[in-house]
């Protein structure tokens, strides 16, 4: 299993997500965008991405706070997440940046095909915003799945 740290722009911030895939599997696979819980892009989020990826998917674990910003406890996570949760436009921008990065990075490694640009599944912790962020972004029907 390969988990590559990928830096990408998110508004005025630079974020650092993880592109995860089984390098021993050949052929194209569906891509899955994984939005971690409000603790952000932790080792646990990457391990969850590895479990989801298995030998069937390419997974991108998104970074919602920016590279190097990692909450250490519940209170700090709340302080970082609440402004994002209150701003639907920023949420959409965050998800779109992560989605576009996932598609570009996976295509560059020849892991997905062009059809992947028209669909996405976002896996997120059960939050009040996960379902409403994914659907309107790409003007295509898009489903979200909560794990």
Where are these regions (language model features)?
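Predominantly soluble domains enriched in secretory-pathway, periplasmic, or organellar proteins
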Residues: 1-2
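Serine-hydrolase catalytic machinery in alpha/beta-hydrolase-like enzymes
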Residues: 5-111
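Primarily recognizes the serine-hydrolase "nucleophile elbow" in alpha/beta-hydrolase
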Residues: 95-147
């Amino acid at each position: 299993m390969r988990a590559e740290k990928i830096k990408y722009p998110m508004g005025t911030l630079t974020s650092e997500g993880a592109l995860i895939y089984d390098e021993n599997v050949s052929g194209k696979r569906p891509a899955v965008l994984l939005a971690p819980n409000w603790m952000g892009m932790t080792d646990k989020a990457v391990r969850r991405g590895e479990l989801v990826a298995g030998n069937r998917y390419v997974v991108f674990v998104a970074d919602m706070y920016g590279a190097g910003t990692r909450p250490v406890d519940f209170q700090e996570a709340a302080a970082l997440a609440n402004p994002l949760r209150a701003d639907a436009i920023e949420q959409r921008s965050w998800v779109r940046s992560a989605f576009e990065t996932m598609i570009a990075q996976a295509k560059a490694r020849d892991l997905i095909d062009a059809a992947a640009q028209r669909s996405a599944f976002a896996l997120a912790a059960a939050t009040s915003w996960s379902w409403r962020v994914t659907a309107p972004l790409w003007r295509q029907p898009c489903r979200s799945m909560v794990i």
